[in-house]
Structures are given as C-alpha cells and as structure tokens.
Curated annotation (Swiss-Prot):
Keywords: Riboflavin biosynthesis, Transferase. Belongs to the DMRL synthase family. SUPFAM superfamilies: Lumazine synthase (SSF52121). The keyword Transferase applies. GO terms for biological process: riboflavin biosynthetic process. This is 6,7-dimethyl-8-ribityllumazine synthase. The keyword Transferase applies.
Length: 156
C-alpha cells in the first residue's frame, strides 16, 4: 500500500474566492502588501471578480472583521494584511499578539484559512523591506499561502 500524499497546489488558484482584509494603520507599508497580494492572486489565475478587499482601521480590528467575513460563507480564504511597528511603549506587544491570536481563533472556529500577513517589525525600515524591497513582499507570500491552503483543504 502506497503512502497517500495530500498537498495544496498553486495552479488551481482560479477556483477560489479570496477576501483580503487590510488594516489601514501604517498605510505607507500596507498599500504595498495589498498590491503584492492582488498581483499574486491575479498572476495565479484568480479573477478580479473573486477578490474582495475589506478595510479595517488597524491590526487590532482585523480579527473581528475576519470573523464576520468568515461567517458570510462568501470566501474560501481570508488574507489579513497590516503592519505593527515597534515603538517606545509596550503597545506593540499587545496589538501584535492579540491580532495574531485572534486571526488564529477565527481560522480554527470557521475551518477557513485565515492567513496572517500582518508585519510585526522593530523599525519602519524593516517594514518597508518586507513590503516589496529587500526582503520580498509579505503580501505576495500571504496570497501564495492562501492559494495553497484553499487547495489543500479541498483535497482533504
């Protein structure tokens, strides 16, 4: 008996419906993440009709909007994008931690892929690097993960 292998395939992207959830805070970074995510979805065959972009004020609000999007049954995956940049107070730790935790809870409770594309960086420079310059575009990477997860869950 052969071992069965289950994987999500990137070439089946056109079959999915994707919500991109964007935290507007630090928009100078997040806009590039959004561009990267949309470009990646489209390059993998996703029609613009199957992409919805929703905006929240910031990373703190992403989990509750993700929960509402998941409950709508209109999407196969949610891609959460945002940028939390460390400052001189502990606010960063609370926002980054609760955002990640909340997105994870939504994914588990809804059985829907909720991809965490929220940058958590120590500096503005790091955030800029991860939004399309030296360190690639994490929005694009999040979109690839969403495509793979949609197809993986369909294959199970």
């Amino acid at each position: 008996m052969a071992i069965r292998r289950i994987e999500g395939l990137l070439h089946l992207a056109s079959e999915g419906r994707y919500a991109i959830l964007v935290g507007r805070f630090n928009s100078f970074v997040v806009e590039h993440l959004l561009e990267g995510a949309i470009d990646t979805l489209k390059r993998h065959g996703v029609s613009e009709d199957n992409i919805t972009v929703a905006y929240a004020p910031g990373a703190w609000e992403l989990p509750i909007v993700a929960k509402k999007l998941a409950a709508s049954d209109k999407f196969d995956a949610i891609i959460a994008l945002g940028a939390v940049i460390r400052g001189s107070t502990p606010h960063f730790d609370f926002v980054a931690g609760e955002c990640a935790k909340g997105l994870g809870v939504v994914a588990l409770e809804s059985s829907l892929p909720v991809i965490n594309g929220v940058l958590t960086t120590d500096s503005i420079e790091q955030a800029i690097e991860r939004s399309g310059t030296k360190a690639g575009n994490k929005g694009s990477e999040a979109a690839l993960t969403a495509i793979e997860m949609v197809n993986l869950l369909k294959a199970i």
